[in-house]
Regions:
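Anion-recognition interface
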Residues: 1-174
């Protein structure tokens, strides 16, 4: 489970970055006012799954480096499967899903509105990547202000707290 504000932020940025998909031309304000493509009511969704599969047959884990086993999503995933992670597992250094930083998303969103051929799209994609690479200091920035994130998360607080109590035995927010 990823905090809903973090999921919304990440999902919109990914759609804009990739382009030519739903929301790839929507402003952040448009998306966040009606993010109907995502299931943010985790408690309700998990209860539906639980009703079909049984609580004992589902694994609920928190998403975030601070929650991953040894800070590794790979190790955490293997642990969830019941597989011991060791040196036999080699993580390739191949192509990664690199993030954009700073205002690169807004530039890319505007470019997504233009009718371009593949060559031009790739040309501008490289330019946006270069702009972003020069602003890695903005890596932790999100589209929400602190107050906006608080308000957004408030909608899901009750369900999130139930999840934390039922699945993690904790009396805290997600």
């Amino acid at each position: 489970l990823r905090r809903q504000d973090s999921l919304a932020d990440s999902w919109w940025k990914q759609k804009v970055k990739v382009g030519r998909r739903i929301y790839s031309t929507s402003s952040w304000e448009e998306f966040v006012s009606d993010p109907s493509q995502l299931e943010f009511d985790y408690y309700g969704a998990i209860k539906k799954i639980e009703a079909v599969l049984g609580k004992e047959n589902i694994i609920i884990r928190r998403f975030g480096k601070q929650y991953f086993k040894n800070g590794s999503i790979y190790e955490d995933f293997m642990e969830a499967l019941g597989v011991r992670y060791d040196s036999r597992f080699v993580i390739s250094e191949g192509k990664r899903n690199n993030s954009l930083f700073g205002n690169s998303h807004e530039i890319k969103r505007i470019l997504n509105m233009l009718n371009m051929n593949k060559h031009d799209r790739l040309f501008f994609k490289r330019i946006v990547r270069e702009i972003s690479d020069n602003h890695t200091d903005l890596k932790g920035e999100t589209m929400f202000s602190a107050e906006e994130a608080r308000q957004f998360m408030e909608k899901y607080r009750e369900g999130n707290r139930k999840l934390m109590q039922e699945y993690f035995g904790k009396d805290e927010d997600l």
